[in-house]
UniProtKB/Swiss-Prot annotation:
<dbReference type="InterPro" id="IPR001719">
    <property type="entry name" value="AP_endonuc_2"/>
</dbReference>
<dbReference type="GO" id="GO:0008270">
    <property type="term" value="F:zinc ion binding"/>
</dbReference>
<feature type="binding site">
    <location>
        <position position="229"/>
    </location>
    <ligand>
        <name>Zn(2+) 3</name>
    </ligand>
</feature>
<feature type="binding site">
    <location>
        <position position="259"/>
    </location>
    <ligand>
        <name>Zn(2+) 2</name>
    </ligand>
</feature>
<keyword id="KW-0378">Hydrolase</keyword>
<feature type="binding site">
    <location>
        <position position="214"/>
    </location>
    <ligand>
        <name>Zn(2+) 2</name>
    </ligand>
</feature>
<dbReference type="GO" id="GO:0008081">
    <property type="term" value="F:phosphoric diester hydrolase activity"/>
</dbReference>
<feature type="binding site">
    <location>
        <position position="227"/>
    </location>
    <ligand>
        <name>Zn(2+) 3</name>
    </ligand>
</feature>
<protein>
    <recommendedName>
        <fullName>Probable endonuclease 4</fullName>
        <ecNumber>3.1.21.2</ecNumber>
    </recommendedName>
</protein>
<comment type="function">
    <text>Endonuclease IV plays a role in DNA repair. It cleaves phosphodiester bonds at apurinic or apyrimidinic (AP) sites, generating a 3'-hydroxyl group and a 5'-terminal sugar phosphate.</text>
</comment>
<keyword id="KW-0479">Metal-binding</keyword>
<dbReference type="InterPro" id="IPR013022">
    <property type="entry name" value="Xyl_isomerase-like_TIM-brl"/>
</dbReference>
<dbReference type="GO" id="GO:0003906">
    <property type="term" value="F:DNA-(apurinic or apyrimidinic site) endonuclease activity"/>
</dbReference>
<dbReference type="InterPro" id="IPR018246">
    <property type="entry name" value="AP_endonuc_F2_Zn_BS"/>
</dbReference>
<dbReference type="InterPro" id="IPR036237">
    <property type="entry name" value="Xyl_isomerase-like_sf"/>
</dbReference>
<dbReference type="GO" id="GO:0003677">
    <property type="term" value="F:DNA binding"/>
</dbReference>
<keyword id="KW-0540">Nuclease</keyword>
Amino acid sequence: MLKIGSHVSMSGKKMLLAASEEAVSYGANTFMIYTGAPQNTRRKAIEELNIEAGHEHMKAHGIEDIVVHAPYIINIGNTKNPDTFALGVNFLRAEIERTEAIGAKQLVLHPGAHVGAGAEAGLRQIIRGLNEVLTREQTVEIALETMAGKGSECGRTFEELAYIIDGVAYNDKLSVCFDTCHTHDAGYDIVNDFDGVLSEFDRVIGLERLKVLHINDSKNPRGSRKDRHENIGFGHIGFRALNYIVHHPQLADIPKILETPYVGEDKNNKKPPYKHEIAMLRAQTFDDQLLEKIVADTQ
């Protein structure tokens, strides 16, 4: 069964219930949340996340497999500022607790950035951080995301992710989130040779570690190292390639999460594209009028 959804918001008093309601309104059967704003580390207590009501709504609508994303501000690759590293380690420990309480199995993490110290130093620091965070007892896996290589980001290549995994003691608690935009922007040819890329991933990392897919088109050509998401079928990856990935038989059980941009000229009234993009991917037919339909949607 196709597991497809999007990033949704966990906010207000409804929290997890609000996230599930939003996902269902898009025709989704999975979703991804941040436990608070992605730009900061302010978080509500677990008791305020409205988990029980959220679970009831999810169960009623056939949603079992959800994903949590750690905030962007976390950087355990930073060797230059001990406070930034310590904040990342401490926050990740607490985020694992929240993720377990919510009932998600995967916590997606941007591995980190070396901020000028060099890739090797950054990778070693990420390993150090994960070794401080991960425990034998935890049930949540940290899903290291494939990165575009923008700035000093670590995790642009499968080899870098494998290096991190190999250096971590409890690496059975590590998985990978494959982002189509990032992988394309990093230089992998997922448009013309996705099966070749998948084989390379399997050889370097192991396909059994692939637990989350971020499905995004890209505003930039392959290898640009930019990381700018585009709506499905309207970027440099294109609908054919993304549809092939979404329906790939080897990836059937993996949650596919859309993180595509809201649509509209009015910055204060942009519309979420997810209901339309999910329907289009389910139908496996590209709609070149999609953006106009999203803007016209009054729901």
